[in-house]
């Protein structure tokens, strides 16, 4: 029994050794096949100097770029910038990395540290960062002809100079510009790989307040003190969606103006009611004007379209309050005139009687025969009105007529005319406002 167990143990041991030998032979064959197909990175980079660009001292390196716009997360009018996440892909040819075969191989992103890569940066960028979750979002791919593909995922905040004079019916033009930091046009030449088709993703973006109308790519030359640099420009137009602002600002302000007209149908004697409506609408309009400016920069160089409309609405609301003040004051003046009417009539009768009695007594005392008229003793200036007194008399008469012309004879007509004029003028102001800012 023990002898049979011993033989079984020996057989199992020999079988295990045989299997190990076959496994080692298989691994050797696999490693040999890998060495035949994969370029040895150590062999490729032997004598490779990552601090020198390809074709150093010769023709410039031609770098072709493509962009994928993943998102535009925010567009800030107060800071005049936008934040975007992009996939930046750069392609160039490095003759030092040529290997046999017709395959391409993706390398670990950490091997980028051993290769030359272009020093591309984003012009007018306020801040940018490379995503690192779960690893650095970079890709390096080598082709057998020496072509290198280098891809990055970047989030950047870029300046966008905005003209807010037509806000919120405005269209903004923003740019994303790429350029080499240190290599001028003699060392590096940038180009778009497929023209406008080099940029993708913008047509699929959905923004909260904007619609992307169009975009196009440009290649320009930036002239600086250190040389001329090739610059790639992506320019896109953003048209603001005005519907949001119509519901948030324009409709409430219009309703406040219409509410202020309600006082025209209230009696002049209802002082508390009309005063309350006027003051409430003025204060509400002021609050709406202040709230509309909280999210915008303090721009002193231009007046925005929304400020113009709110100013128009505030003028009508305040005008309705002044209209009641004028109508009420005219009503009080008319009542005062009516109260003074009987007293004034009796006063005029007394004055007439006194004048008539004085004239009759004066006629009895004066005898025209006793008056000796002598040319040397008569002062004609005493017998005629002076020119200055005549001018004052005529001027006072004219002023009195003008005052009587503008004096409101019937205060109830003020409300009657206001019911027609205020809505008519407000509608005309809206027609001119929307026609100007929408089509000019």
Curated annotation (Swiss-Prot):
Family: Belongs to the ligand-gated ion channel (TC 1.A.9) family. Gamma-aminobutyric acid receptor (TC 1.A.9.5) subfamily. GABRP sub-subfamily.
Transmembrane segments: 242-262, 271-290, 302-322, 420-440
Catalytic activity: chloride(in) = chloride(out)
Domain notes: GABAARs subunits share a common topological structure: a peptide sequence made up of a long extracellular N-terminal, four transmembrane domains, intracellular or cytoplasmic domain located between the third and the fourth transmembrane domains.
Organism: Rattus norvegicus
NCBIfam families according to UniProt: LIC
Protein name according to UniProt: Gamma-aminobutyric acid receptor subunit pi
Assembly with partners or alone: Heteropentamer, formed by a combination of alpha (GABRA1-6), beta (GABRB1-3), gamma (GABRG1-3), delta (GABRD), epsilon (GABRE), rho (GABRR1-3), pi (GABRP) and theta (GABRQ) chains, each subunit exhibiting distinct physiological and pharmacological properties.
UniProt gene name: Gabrp
Annotated glycosylation sites: 43, 102, 145, 196, 228
GO CC, one annotated term: plasma membrane
Leader sequence segment: 1-23
């Amino acid at each position: 029994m023990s002898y049979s167990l011993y033989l079984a143990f020996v057989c199992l041991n020999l079988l295990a050794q045989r299997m190990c030998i076959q496994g080692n032979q298989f691994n050797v064959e696999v490693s040999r096949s890998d060495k035949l197909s994969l370029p040895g990175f150590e062999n490729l980079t032997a004598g490779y100097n990552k601090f020198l660009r390809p074709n150093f001292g010769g023709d410039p390196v031609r770098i072709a770029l493509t962009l994928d716009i993943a998102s535009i997360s925010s567009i800030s009018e107060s800071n005049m910038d936008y934040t975007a996440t992009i996939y930046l892909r750069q392609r160039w040819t490095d003759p030092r990395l040529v290997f046999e075969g017709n395959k391409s191989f993706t390398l670990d992103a950490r091997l980028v540290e051993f290769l030359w890569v272009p020093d591309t940066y984003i012009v007018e960028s306020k801040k940018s960062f490379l995503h690192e979750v779960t690893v650095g979002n970079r890709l390096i791919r080598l082709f057998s002809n020496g072509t290198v593909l280098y891809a990055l995922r970047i989030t950047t905040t870029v300046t966008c100079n905005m003209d807010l004079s037509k806000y919120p019916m405005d269209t903004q033009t923003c740019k994303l510009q790429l350029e080499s930091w240190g290599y001028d046009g003699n060392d590096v030449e940038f180009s778009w790989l497929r023209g406008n088709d080099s940029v993708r993703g913008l047509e699929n973006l959905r923004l909260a307040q904007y619609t992307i109308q169009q975009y196009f790519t440009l290649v320009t030359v930036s002239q600086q003190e250190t040389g001329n640099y090739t610059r790639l420009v992506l320019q896109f137009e953003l048209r603001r969606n005005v519907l949001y602002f119509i519901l948030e600002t324009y409709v409430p302000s219009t309703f406040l103006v219409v509410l202020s007209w309600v006082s025209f149908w209230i009696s002049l004697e209802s002082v508390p009611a009309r005063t309350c409506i006027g003051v409430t609408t003025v204060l509400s309009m002021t609050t709406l004007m202040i709230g509309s400016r909280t999210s915008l920069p303090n721009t002193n160089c231009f007046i925005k379209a929304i400020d113009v409309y709110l100013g128009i609405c505030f003028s009508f609301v305040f005008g309705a309050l002044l209209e009641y003040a004028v109508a009420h004051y005219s009503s009080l003046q008319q009542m005062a005139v009516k109260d003074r009417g009987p007293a004034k009539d009796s006063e005029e009768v007394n004055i007439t009687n006194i004048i008539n009695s004085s004239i009759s007594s004066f006629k009895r005392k004066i005898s025209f025969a006793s008056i000796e008229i002598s040319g040397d003793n008569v002062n004609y200036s005493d017998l005629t009105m002076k020119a200055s007194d005549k001018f004052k008399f005529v001027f006072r008469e004219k002023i009195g007529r003008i005052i009587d012309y503008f004096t409101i004879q019937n205060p109830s007509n003020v409300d009657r005319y206001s019911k027609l004029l205020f809505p008519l003028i407000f509608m005309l102001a809206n027609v001119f406002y929307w026609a100007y800012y929408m089509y000019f």
